[in-house]
């Protein structure tokens, strides 16, 4: 439908469905319902612009599905981006059909989904979304300085430099090493391909909105509808879809990209990046030999410069936290860590494939075949062990607190107990301030 080859379409599909954001939220039904809705909604508008009239009713059903079943904030962002998509297609086709189709399927979809929308709108005034949220409550997950590393190393977490998955600060960027490099290479097509230019703009916005100092999230907070939603990570759903499409466009047009006078510089940049990765890993390896001396130096600095600004728990507490995080840092970048090993090899092999193609060691046809196999293996191997298993005893055996409650309440009162704290409970116990993520564990 976007004039992509079967190989490019397959790679885009793999990158979209198996990207990190989908893996992270896949177990949550409203989020998993978004996966199908996003591509189908854009597809419906595209089909309508091409005079395929069957997509008017199909598009209405897709709109209703999104409104009734998917996560509202992401659906809202999809509708906003969908309007821009319709404007883009109107400009390309010189027809008003994309605009008319967009408003028609949106309106009819809303009517079909009214069984859910009307009760929600009626109840909305009793919720925190009944009025505009203050900006200080809106964003808590802006991109940290080292978060871009997760485009290549999806499991890496560096204290104070990356977001923390276990705290809901979700830096989910990974779509595969080669697919991300292909998406970057699509920049060479921006002036030649309007479709690539549009989706490149979507990617750029979805990334810039997550950077605090750009002020974009603050600006759109003043627009109707946007002021009811919080958390910039929701834009990752749109961004990952756009990145996957760009990877497909780049693959099919790689011969044109190779003709660019800047392509050699691109390859040189990849070589430097590969060498930097290797050097960094070697440095981390040798740091392990001086672990104790480095930790002692960190302890001295913390005791002299940082301790007075904390809650001044016993020093042993802070030293234990520092040791724990330092060990996690070393382990995260160790070849004994399966996920790091796969990530590291994926980066080097992806760059090697580009280098061999640039040097004419492999032709375009073989590049596509190798890319398909590599992307599949990369995305399958990298997510092995992503979902951790919980011991059955954690569920079937009552903790002491639950046993006490069950033994001291009347037997005819039927209670069900869930032993795990919901995500927000750490706020209630003062582990850290939700508006200040920098003090995790150190206060």
Residue locations for each model-derived region?
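Conserved luminal/periplasmic juxtamembrane motif of membrane-embedded glycan-processing enzymes
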Residues: 1-443
């Amino acid at each position: 439908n976007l004039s992509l080859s079967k190989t490019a379409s397959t790679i885009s599909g793999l990158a979209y469905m198996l990207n990190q954001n989908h893996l992270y939220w896949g177990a949550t039904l409203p989020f998993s319902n978004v996966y199908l809705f996003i591509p189908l909604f854009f597809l419906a508008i595209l089909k309508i612009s091409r005079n395929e009239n069957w997509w008017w009713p199909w598009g209405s059903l897709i709109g209703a599905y999104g409104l009734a079943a998917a996560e509202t904030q992401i659906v809202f962002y999809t509708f906003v981006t969908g309007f821009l998509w319709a404007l883009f297609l109107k400009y390309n086709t010189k027809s008003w059909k994309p605009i008319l189709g967009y408003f028609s399927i949106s309106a009819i979809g809303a009517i079909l989904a009214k069984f859910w929308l009307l009760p929600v709108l009626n109840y909305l005034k009793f919720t925190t979304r009944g009025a505009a949220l203050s900006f200080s409550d809106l964003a808590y997950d802006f991109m940290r300085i080292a978060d871009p590393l997760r485009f290549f190393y999806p499991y890496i977490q560096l204290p104070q430099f990356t977001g923390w998955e276990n705290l809901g600060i979700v830096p989910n960027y990974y779509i595969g090493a080669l697919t991300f490099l292909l998406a970057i290479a699509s920049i060479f097509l921006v002036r030649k391909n309007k479709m690539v230019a549009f989706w490149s703009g979507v990617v750029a916005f979805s990334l810039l909105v997550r950077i605090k100092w750009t002020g974009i999230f603050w600006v759109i907070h003043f627009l109707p509808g946007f002021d009811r939603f919080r958390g910039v990570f929701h834009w990752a759903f749109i961004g990952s879809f756009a990145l996957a499409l760009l990877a497909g466009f780049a693959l099919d047009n790689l011969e044109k990209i190779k003709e660019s006078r800047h392509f050699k510089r691109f390859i040189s940049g990849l070589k430097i990046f590969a060498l930097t990765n290797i050097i960094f890993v070697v440095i981390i390896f040798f740091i392990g030999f001086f672990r104790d001396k480095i930790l002692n130096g960190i302890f001295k600095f913390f005791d002299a410069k940082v301790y007075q600004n904390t809650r001044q728990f016993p020093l042993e507490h802070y030293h234990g936290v520092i040791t724990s995080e330092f060990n996690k840092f070393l382990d995260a970048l160790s070849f004994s860590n399966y996920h790091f090993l796969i990530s590291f090899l994926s980066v080097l092999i992806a760059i090697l494939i580009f280098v061999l193609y640039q040097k004419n060691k492999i032709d375009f046809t073989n590049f596509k075949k190798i890319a398909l196999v590599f992307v599949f293996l990369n995305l399958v191997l990298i997510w092995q062990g992503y979902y951790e298993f919980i011991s059955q005893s954690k569920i079937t055996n009552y903790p002491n607190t639950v046993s006490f409650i069950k033994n001291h309440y009347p037997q005819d009162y039927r209670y069900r107990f869930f032993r795990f704290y919901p995500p927000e409970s750490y706020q209630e116990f003062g582990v850290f301030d939700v508006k200040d993520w920098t003090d995790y564990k150190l206060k």
